[in-house]
Amino acid sequence: MTTSIIERIDAWAEKTPDFPCYEYAGTRLSYKELKRQSDAFGSFLLKTLNTDKEKPIIVYGHMSPLMLVAFLGSIKSGRAYVPVDVSMPVERIEQIKKAADPSLFICTEELPSNLTITGCPVLTQDQLMDALEKHFGEVPDKEACVKNDDNYYIIYTSGSTGNPKGVQISQNNLVSFSNWILQDFSLSQGLRFLNQAPFSFDLSVMDLYPSLLSGGTLVPLDKTITANMKDLYREIPAQNLDVWVSTPSFADLCLLDDNFNQENNPGLIHFLFCGEVLAKKTASELLNRFPDAVIYNTYGPTEATVAVTQVKVTREVIDAYPSLPLGVIKPDMRLHIVDQETGEVLPEGEKGEIVLIGASVSKGYLNEPEKTDQVFFDYKGYQAYRTGDSGIIKDGYLFFQGRLDFQIKLHGYRIELEDIENNLKKVSYIQNCAIIPKMKDEKVDMLVAQVIPTNHDFEKEYQLSAAIKNELKEFMPAYMIPRKWIYKTEFPLTMNGKIDRKALNSEVNK
């Protein structure tokens, strides 16, 4: 099997040229069209970009077929891409642009009116369409394509300083991940994959590349649909899905609809979950509703290419453990549980930090050598990553035991609580704050902000909360904004003078 992602995707243009690689809301893109358009765009980039190929290309948009064309065209020109979704606030986009130092900023949709990109060329949607037309029929030099350990994509995740970090994923990383998904999860040719996550979220890689590499069809549910439950419940059975890829929270939302079942979705027999804890209650209800389906629980950080462990969730597994296991490590990886202080590898049954070693592990953070050295290291010639996750191995399965720091998963998004706190402290009405995750059914249900406010003239607390949220939305993504607000005159402190987070946590999670 060829190791080139692009060659394997392009091969479907010969095998099944008219089969849709993307289909949604009347928009259809065939494998032949994907190849021709990405060839044209790759040719355009090779002829017009003279900058260092180490500099990535930012692709701005939202789950459209044009984003796929831009991704693959960038790869064919030898440059990694950075997906940036339209839902991101302007300040976040500016932070990513500054950190990535891109060679080009591609707009597959219009930029917000209050965002101006400087310091690199910008390609508008009209210019992109014009480039595809002018270079139609051209084929870029295969030698120019991203290969081996070259960066393939870079996804920005939450950083503890308030600035996002760019995780570099190479072609080799992506090949390892994609081969594992297709083989271990028994995904055959021509299946229809749900695309729930925006491309700026690495969960999307779990549907995008397994779909394209197996000659399948990517079926996105964009933000206009997922924001309206009636539309969502109507659309899901209409899409004739075979493979479900989402966060558990999204499945919980769909399970609120009594019609979300096997009868109305007869082909839906593969469920793949990642991004947060899969509760036993969710898995059990899915098995009730979809008796023909196979459910997989997976685990992995962005730094190890989406996911590295898997377990098939059966009634026996649900009944055997108090919480669902994360599964077993993929064949070309090793997993150690280590003592966080000494680095000593711990035996089965002891809790410690999860360390991942092998083919899926990223080379590090783009343009951030110090942050890279803090968590990435060489282990006997293999790349290794300290996850900051606490875990334990029982019966050969990995079990998640929470975060060792202030990082959590909420609705599939990885969030540094310090990131939120640093951003909240920018708000004029906040003197000090602490963010506490409220737990429900073994996972984070919502974020609670405990706040010491500055002097203000609001009569009611809800008025203060509204004013704070109004400021926050200018520079923080919606999923990071706390849902509940508690106001205090002072915080409890530990003996060494730090905020007593255990005390605050016990208040929130009584």
Swiss-Prot record:
Recorded GO MF terms: ATP binding; D-alanine [D-alanyl carrier protein] ligase activity
Binding site for ATP: 157-158, 297-302, 389, 498
A biological-process GO annotation: lipoteichoic acid biosynthetic process
Purpose of the protein: Catalyzes the first step in the D-alanylation of lipoteichoic acid (LTA), the activation of D-alanine and its transfer onto the D-alanyl carrier protein (Dcp) DltC. In an ATP-dependent two-step reaction, forms a high energy D-alanyl-AMP intermediate, followed by transfer of the D-alanyl residue as a thiol ester to the phosphopantheinyl prosthetic group of the Dcp. D-alanylation of LTA plays an important role in modulating the properties of the cell wall in Gram-positive bacteria, influencing the net charge of the cell wall.
Keywords: ATP-binding, Cytoplasm, Ligase, Nucleotide-binding
NCBIfam families, per database record: AA-adenyl-dom (TIGR01733), D-ala-DACP-lig (TIGR01734), PRK04813.1 (NF003417)
Catalyzed chemical reaction(s): holo-[D-alanyl-carrier protein] + D-alanine + ATP = D-alanyl-[D-alanyl-carrier protein] + AMP + diphosphate
Listed pathway(s): Cell wall biogenesis; lipoteichoic acid biosynthesis
Origin superkingdom: Bacteria
HAMAP family: DltA (MF_00593)
Keyword check for Secreted: no
Compartments in which it is found: Cytoplasm
CC annotations in GO: cytoplasm
One Pfam assignment: AMP-binding
Protein name per its UniProtKB record: D-alanine--D-alanyl carrier protein ligase
Lineage per the UniProt record: Bacteria, Bacillati, Bacillota, Bacilli, Bacillales
Enzyme class: ligase
Residue numbers binding D-alanine: 202, 306, 498
Gene3D superfamilies: 3.30.300.30, N-terminal domain of ligase-like
Entry-linked PANTHER family: ENZYME, PUTATIVE (JCVI)-RELATED (PTHR45398:SF1), PTHR45398
EC number, as in UniProt: 6.2.1.54
